Amino acid sequence: MTRVVISVGGSVLVPSLDAHRLKEWAEALINLTNAGIQIFAVVGGGGEARRYIEACRDIGLDEASSDEIGIQVTRINAALLIGALKEYAYPVVAESYREAKTAAVSGKIVVMGGVTPGQTTDAVAAVLAEEVGASMMINMTAIDGIYTADPKKDAKAKRHDILSPQGLIDLIMKEKMCAGSNMVIDLVAAKITERSGIPLVVIDGRDPALIEKALLKGEFAGTIVGNSAIRFPIV
């Protein structure tokens, strides 16, 4: 069975606590499962996690402790997604890579949040893709791909259709030098992707149906990092 790890940004899964939005995501993941793809979803904390982390800093907590609380928020979001998936999901949020691999034996959708302080859920997804031998990692975020520059700030920015792992790392390093920059994926995740050789695909997560269109219908719009030989649909 084809295995796919999906990093679902909290900002696209739960921009607000909206049951309809969660059901849309659940429907998309269930349709992928029914098509014969085993899904692993790593859920981010979104704006809620950032608010908690900021509150932690305001009361004087150290960064590691603040991260731990942020991780708890990602796991709450993961639990919400499990609830929406119902019997299609493994019923417990995986809190480690070992737990995720054990849960995968069930054949159900495995959902997890953060794991380690200082590590983003994108990095968690990249490591998980290695651990479970995924054929690809998909980053579902609030933009439709990786651009030459921030499209919100540069009208001339163009979306990359295909990008090498080193090209992604170079782009992230360039952006990190600019105050307030906001890359689609972080440097650690990009380096893990380069190491593993597992292709990274970036798709606009604001519409959950787009992942179905790409994987099941071949209607792909986004950026492929790594193996340019990937062809959609994958089943």
Swiss-Prot record:
Q: What UniProt keywords are attached to this protein's entry?
A: ATP-binding, Cytoplasm, Kinase, Nucleotide-binding, Pyrimidine biosynthesis, Transferase
Its recorded reaction(s) are:
UMP + ATP = UDP + ADP
Stated role? Catalyzes the reversible phosphorylation of UMP to UDP.
Cysteine disulfide partners in this protein: none
**Family, per entry:** Belongs to the UMP kinase family.
Activity regulation annotation text: Inhibited by UTP.
One annotated GO biological process = UDP biosynthetic process
- Binding residues for ATP: G10, S11, G46, R50, T141, Y147, D150
Q: Name one Pfam family in it.
A: AA_kinase
Q: In which pathway does it act?
A: Pyrimidine metabolism; CTP biosynthesis via de novo pathway; UDP from UMP (UMPK route): step 1/1
Q: Per UniProt, where does UMP bind?
A: G45, D67, V115, T116, P117, G118, Q119, T120, T121
NCBIfam families for the chain: pyrH_arch
Molecular-function GO term, any one = UMP kinase activity
What are the annotated GO cellular component locations? cytoplasm
What subcellular compartments does it reside in? Cytoplasm
Quaternary structure and partners:
Homohexamer.
Protein name as catalogued: Uridylate kinase
EC nos: 2.7.4.22
Q: Does the keyword Coiled coil apply?
A: no
